[in-house]
Amino acid sequence: MILPINTYSDEVLRRKAKPLKESDAQLEELISNMLESMRNAEGIGLAAPQVGVSLRLIVVDLSLAEGYEAASPMVVINPHILSVKSFNSMEEGCLSIPDVRGDVVRPSAIQLKYRDRNFEECIGEFDRLAARVIQHEIDHLDGTLFVDRMQRRDRRKIQKELDALSRGEINTNYPVAFHEDSVVK
C-alpha cells in the first residue's frame, strides 16, 4: 500500500523516533509499504517518520541511482553510527521537502550498527552515496531535516520555497500528508 509522505511543516518530522523492540507482522507490513511508497515517489531512502510513524526504521534502495542499478533494498532498524571518516559536501533533496535541494556537508564513510529486516544485529561499512542516504534518513529519526544542516546563507536562498511548503503549496506526483491530516504512532 502506498502511504502518503509527510511534508516539511509536519511535527512528526521534528520528533525523536522511538526504538523498535522486536519484529512482528505489523513491522513487516510497514516495511513493505515504505518500500512501495519510496519507489512510487522515485526516492532512494525513506524514514518511518516521513510516513507518520515515529519509529527508528529506514529503508534504502539505491537501484534508481546511476551506478547503483544492482543495489538491493536495505532495511535499517535502530541505527547507531559507530564511526565516521572524512567529510564532503553534496547536494541533497528529500521527499518530505519536494523540489528543494541544497548542499550538505556529511561524513563520506560510516560504520553503522543496526538491526536488519530479520531483526538480526549487523555492523556495516558504508561510503559514498550509501553513507549519505543512511545519514540523511537517520537525521529524520532524530527530528532533523537536511535544510537544518545547510549553511545559513544557502538556507536563506530557499526560504521562499520552504515558506510555500509550510502553507501547503506542494506539487508532487506522489501522495503527501499535511500536518492537519497526519497520523503519529
Curated annotation (Swiss-Prot):
It comes from Chlorobium phaeobacteroides (strain BS1). HAMAP family: Pep_deformylase (MF_00163). The keyword Metal-binding applies. The keyword Membrane does not apply. The active site is at residue 137. One of its GO terms (biological process) is translation. The gene is def. Binds 1 Fe(2+) ion. This is Peptide deformylase. InterPro entries: Peptide_deformylase, Peptide_deformylase_sf.
